[in-house]
Amino acid sequence: MPLSARNHLPGVIEEIQRDTIIAHVVIRVGEHLVESVITRRSADELALEVGDHVTAVVKATEVMVAKP
């Protein structure tokens, strides 16, 4: 499926926590972890499970950078 977002990060789901409305998905991308918050419905429709190979798609308008 073609997307306009240019930042595609292939990885493996390390953790998923489904709440009533949202799901927190932790994806290992190389040495790093990327966390995504998606709707519970989307997580269920994609049948996401720990160990699944997925791609994190990042849009530049949705990324913030903070310096400790």
Spans of model-derived segments:
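Non-catalytic connector elements of ABC transporters
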Residues: M1-P68
